[in-house]
Amino acid sequence: MTGLNTAGSDRDYDTQSLNRELQDKGFLLTTTEDLINWARTGSLHWMTFGLACCAVEMMHTSMPRYDVERFGVAPRASPRQSDVMIVAGTLTNKMAPALRKVYDQMPEPRYVISMGSCANGGGYYHYSYSVVRGCDRIVPVDIYVPGCPPTAEALLYGILQLQRKIRRTGTITR
């Protein structure tokens, strides 16, 4: 082991021992980035971009049976107040610039969930001349939720996967 590797492992050991001592006294030792990610996962605000029948399932997720707000996710009507955009339904060539414009209005960090076969890859209308073959050609997508239409449980699982992804990745990089 080189001196550089030894110094790094000693530092980790010192941090772990200090963390154990502080936990016994009721304190928490963490990084600012972990704290920010923890807060961000518990307060995601999603904006709907419902274009077709998948939007109905998106509404079911907000209803009392599934109650997505218990996970800290709440709907917002304005892109300037939202962190997550859920694209649900068939995206046409005519609607693509509007999707990009709304995405650009969202503050950083912003996340996109593509919901349903039509948003993921064009779906049933894949070979139509006027359909975009996946919203990932217009905006970067973080989570894909498959199905036609996907169930509310599938969307809920996708939201939980997004929260896990936010916890795993840093605040600077996406």
Curated annotation (Swiss-Prot):
Q: Which cofactor does it need?
A: [4Fe-4S] cluster
InterPro entries, alphabetically?
A: NADH_UbQ_OxRdtase-like_20kDa, NADH_UQ_OxRdtase_20Kd_su
GO CC entries: plasma membrane; respiratory chain complex I
GO molecular function per UniProt:
4 iron, 4 sulfur cluster binding; iron ion binding; NADH dehydrogenase (ubiquinone) activity; NADH:ubiquinone reductase (non-electrogenic) activity; quinone binding
The protein, known as: NADH-quinone oxidoreductase subunit B 1
Pfam name, any one: Oxidored_q6
Q: Where is [4Fe-4S] cluster annotated to bind?
A: 53-54, 118, 148
> Topology with regard to the membrane?
Peripheral membrane protein
How does the annotation summarize its subunit structure?
A: NDH-1 is composed of 14 different subunits. Subunits NuoB, C, D, E, F, and G constitute the peripheral sector of the complex.
Which subcellular locations apply to this protein? Cell inner membrane
Top-rank taxon? Bacteria
- Where is it chiefly localized? membrane
Q: Catalysed reaction(s)?
A: a quinone + NADH + 5 H(+)(in) = a quinol + NAD(+) + 4 H(+)(out)
Listed as disulfide-bonded, the cysteine pairs are: none
The UniProt record lists the EC number as: 7.1.1.-
Question: PROSITE patterns, from UniProt?
Answer: COMPLEX1_20K
Q: Which UniProt keywords apply?
A: 4Fe-4S, Cell inner membrane, Cell membrane, Iron, Iron-sulfur, Membrane, Metal-binding, NAD, Quinone, Translocase, Transport, Ubiquinone
Q: Tell me, which GO biological process terms does this entry list?
A: aerobic respiration; electron transport coupled proton transport
Q: How is the cofactor bound?
A: Binds 1 [4Fe-4S] cluster.
Underlying gene: nuoB1
Task: Name the job this protein performs.
Answer: NDH-1 shuttles electrons from NADH, via FMN and iron-sulfur (Fe-S) centers, to quinones in the respiratory chain. The immediate electron acceptor for the enzyme in this species is believed to be ubiquinone. Couples the redox reaction to proton translocation (for every two electrons transferred, four hydrogen ions are translocated across the cytoplasmic membrane), and thus conserves the redox energy in a proton gradient.
> Record's family?
Belongs to the complex I 20 kDa subunit family.
| Signal peptide range in chain numbering | none
What the entry lists under HAMAP family is as follows: NDH1_NuoB
